[in-house]
Swiss-Prot record:
This is Methionine--tRNA ligase, mitochondrial. Optimum pH is 7.8-8.2. It is linked to Spastic ataxia 3, autosomal recessive: A neurologic disorder characterized by cerebellar ataxia, ataxic gait, spasticity, and hyperreflexia. Other variable features include dysarthria, dysmetria, mild cognitive impairment, urinary urgency and dystonic positioning. Combined oxidative phosphorylation deficiency 25: A mitochondrial disorder resulting in developmental delay, growth failure, and sensorineural hearing loss. The gene is MARS2. ATP binds at residue 350. Gene3D superfamilies: 2.170.220.10, HUPs (3.40.50.620), Isoleucyl-tRNA Synthetase, Domain 1 (1.10.730.10). Residues 1-29 form a transit peptide. Its main location: mitochondrion. Belongs to the class-I aminoacyl-tRNA synthetase family. It comes from Homo sapiens. The keyword Protein biosynthesis applies. A motif ('HIGH' region) lies at residues 52-62. The lineage of its organism: Eukaryota, Metazoa, Chordata, Craniata, Vertebrata. Transmembrane segments: none annotated.
């Protein structure tokens, strides 16, 4: 049974080369995949983060959104030769009442506040290695053109009318709320005040003449879209939540405010007395980036994956698709939703003083280390908790000890004095398990390792396609542990290169371990790009050999040539990931019970 499994997973005899991309490549990716969408490598893919509000400095939740999109985009680039077929946008949302009020409180002009905070986001993303192709600011002239054109399309299709809106408005969330979404909260002096049930932020009663979007017309079209596209919103629980929202009637939506009340925004075309609602303004950024309203945007839309936090799900899963349908356009291909980061079980809050500065974390834990932590520990389905001890424990265990230790052991001069990729001996490790002979040294567990690593790229790709990057890293970590077990089991440091009996098996053990490391390094590129580069460079893997299309694993297992066999390793550059010092003062300690 094991032999059949290994042969099926590792390739077919008679093949000129063992190609994992051939056996487990794009033809296995679903048509709704995040990374490809079709079999062709040059099919366009467009990844977006939310544009981040500039009323406060960036925190780790913002960085997490950007890292999810970055890893998805980087993995997509590994799958094909054309990086021009991939776009990745992020940016800042700079209009609205909150910005207007925050600037006034700080004694700044709104433009000055926006410039200052937008620069903080740009610096953070540059330091964190976010590989965005576009950084959009909603104060840019190109965006104003796009928003006003989009408004004109909605108006020309009879979807905007002027009327008196009367109801609850939450300035903090920049949204209107029905009565059912408002509750009374006790105040410190015993009186009560109205707040949003969803966010807990205060709301106020508003009555004014606005432009109103006929959202009520789109309830059934939205239901048909979601029921016909079960992967449109992922993970599945969020898809279910949106369908539950759509069980209720959708009220028409106010999409402007009086300019006398809100002047910091984009004016309604032909009516300077009104300012376009900040969420309609903000959502159009996804079109601005790809050239809307020029025809070029059609080559990118709707091949889009929006990565968003769960707090803005309604805006992206109901309002935005309704706006698009109203404008005669398709909804986005995929909306990927993630939950929040808490700190020691509590929501991050300025008042609690527990907001974690991501730039401090990048400096303390290294860029690759903190990227790995957030993507390894972050689970989109539910909130994840942050504290420093968890970061140190994970990075020391998985990057410093398991992965770094494996690389050091297999490339150390004492074990590999020639500093080359040793030869693989097919008589020591035959492709048929269970063979008996004086030269056969491979054990059943060794075939299980080969099988696990051979299927790893396909498994990782499936996890990326299903927005489970944490599962992809879990799978890589599991194979790293298996490979360490393989090396420990055969103890190459006890074998002698001078012995005609030991030497072929010693070379084979190192060859298999280095091949496993090459797979790990290739698959870690989207998450830890610098660390992966260091690992692959140490193995002597050139830049042109690092895509999934070049990931031929263990071809000598079938006696086919291996391009790395006999190749000199790259230069020694120190530890792959130095262990973190646990004696340092924690930024955030875990609560002790």
């Amino acid at each position: 049974m094991l032999r059949t499994s290994v042969l099926r997973l590792l390739g077919r005899t008679g093949a000129s080369r063992l190609s994992l991309l051939e056996d487990f490549g794009p033809r296995y990716y679903s048509s709704g995949s995040l990374s490809a969408g079709d079999d062709a490598c040059d099919v366009r893919a467009y990844f977006t983060t939310p544009i981040f509000y500039v009323n406060a400095a960036p925190h780790i939740g913002h960085l997490y959104s950007a890292l999810l999109a970055d890893a998805l985009c980087r993995h997509r680039r590994l799958r094909g030769p054309s990086t021009a077929a991939t776009r990745f946008s992020t940016g800042t949302d700079e209009h609205g009442l909150k910005i207007q009020q925050a600037a006034a409180t700080a004694g700044l002009a709104p433009t000055e506040l926006c410039d200052r905070v937008s620069e903080q986001f740009q610096q953070l993303f540059q330091e964190a290695g976010i590989s965005c192709t576009d950084f959009i600011r909603t104060t840019e002239a190109r965006h104003r053109v796009a928003v006003q054109h989009f408004w004109g399309v909605l108006k020309s299709r009879g979807l905007l009318y002027k009327g008196v809106y009367e109801g609850w408005y939450c300035a903090s969330d920049e949204c209107f709320l029905p009565e059912a979404k408002v509750t009374q909260q006790p105040g410190p002096s015993g009186d009560s005040f109205p707040v949003s049930l969803e966010s807990g932020h205060p709301v106020s009663w508003t009555k004014e003449e606005n432009y109103i979007f006929r959202l009520s017309q789109f309830r059934k079209p939205l239901q048909r879209w979601l029921r016909g596209n079960p992967q449109a919103i992922t993970p599945e629980p969020f898809h279910h939540v949106v369908l539950q929202w759509l069980d209720e009637e959708l009220p028409d939506l106010s999409v402007s405010r009086r300019s006398s009340h809100l002047h910091w925004g984009i004016p309604v075309p032909g009516d300077d007395s009104q300012t376009i609602y900040v969420w309609l303004d903000a959502l159009v950024n996804y079109l601005t980036v790809i050239g809307y309203p020029n025809a070029e945007f059609k080559s990118w839309w709707p091949a889009t994956s929006h990565i968003i936090g769960k707090d803005i799900l309604k805006f992206h899963a109901i309002y935005w698709p309704a706006f698009l349908l109203g404008a005669g356009m398709s909804p986005p291909q995929r909306i990927c939703v993630h939950s929040h980061w808490t700190v020691c079980g509590q929501k991050m809050s300025k008042s609690l003083g527990n907001v974690v500065d991501p730039r401090t974390c990048l400096n303390r834990y290294t860029v690759d280390g903190f990227r790995y932590f957030l993507l390894r520990q972050g689970v989109p389905n539910w909130d994840c908790d942050y504290y420093d001890e968890k970061v140190v424990k994970l990075l020391n265990s998985e990057l410093a000890d398991a992965l770094g230790g494996l690389l050091n052991r297999c490339t150390a001069k004492r074990i590999n004095p020639s500093e080359t990729y040793p030869a693989f001996c097919t008589t020591c490790f035959p492709s048929e398990p269970g063979l008996v002979g004086p030269s056969v040294r491979a054990q059943a567990e060794d075939y299980a390792l080969v099988s696990a690593v051979a299927t790893l790229p396909k498994q990782v790709a499936d996890h990326y396609d299903n927005f489970r990057i944490y599962k992809a890293l879990e799978a890589v970590s599991s194979c790293v542990r298996q490979t360490n077990g393989f090396v420990q089991r055969h103890a190459p440091w006890k074998l002698n290169w001078e012995s005609p009996v030991d030497a072929p098996w010693l070379g084979t053990v190192l060859h298999v371990a280095l091949e496993c490391l090459r797979v790990f390094g290739t698959l870690l590129q989207p998450v830890t790009p610098s660390l992966a580069d260091k690992l692959l460079s140490r193995l002597g893997v050139s830049a042109s050999e690092r895509s999934l299309g070049e990931l031929y694993f263990l071809p000598r297992f079938y006696g086919h040539p291996c391009p790395f066999e006999g190749r000199r390793l790259g230069p020694e550059t120190g530890l792959l990931f130095p262990r973190l010092d646990q004696s340092r003062t924690w930024l955030v300690k875990a609560h002790r019970t």
